[in-house]
Amino acid sequence: MLFLFISGCTREINPILDEMTDVRDNQTYQTVTLGDQTWLAQNLNYETDDSWCFQNDPAYCETYGRLYNWEAAMNACPDGWHLPSDQEWSALIKYLDPLSRPNAVLTESKTAGGLMKTTGTIQDGTGLWAEPNTGATNITKFSVVPGGERVPTPSGMFNLLGQHAFFWTSTEYATNSAGFRTLDYGHSGVTKGTSTTNMTKAYGLSVRCIMD
C-alpha cells in the first residue's frame, strides 16, 4: 500500500496485481486493479487487421504492443474486456489525482502521468523513455511505455517511439475522429484529446483494455 501526498491531502494508492491469458493467442498480460477498475498493465499485442508493430518490426511488438487504428481498437480486446471510454480514463486519472480536471482542454492532470510511467531512461540504459522522463515513479504499476504512433500516410509513417504514449478511447467526437490520452517524456501529466485536438481514426495508437 502506498500513500501519495497531494497539496496537503493524503491519497492512498493500492495497486493489486494479477495476470490474465488471452485465449485467442495464449499471450499472458499483467493486470492491475486501481480503485474499482481493473486494467491491463501492458499494451495489447493481439494481431488484427489494421494493427502494426512499430516500423513493422515484430521485435517492437514484444516490448510496446501493437498500434491499432480506432476501428481495430474497438474490437481488439478479449472477451470480458473492452476499449475504455473517455469517462473510464477520467475515472482512473481522478483516482490518481483528485485535482484532475476531466473537462479541461488538453492537460487533464499535471501529476498522474508520472505515477503511471515506467522509470528510467534510454540514455542511461535503465528504461524505455527518452530523458528526462519527468516525474516517472510507476507507483501505480500501470507501467506506461512510450510506443509512439503510426501516421496514416500512404506507406505508413512511425513517430515518437521513446517519447510519447498514445492510447485510444472508445469515445467518438466526430465521424472520423475519436478521443485519446497522451503521456510524454517531458511532462508528468496526462493530456486529453478533445473535439478540437483529436486524431483521425486512421492513426495507429496503443490500446489498454479495461475489464467489463
Segment roles from a protein language model:
Residues 11-212:
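Conserved positions within compact, well-structured domain cores
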Residues 1-2:
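Sec-dependent signal peptide recognition
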Residues 6-8:
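C-terminal motif of bacterial Sec signal peptides marking the signal peptidase cleavage site
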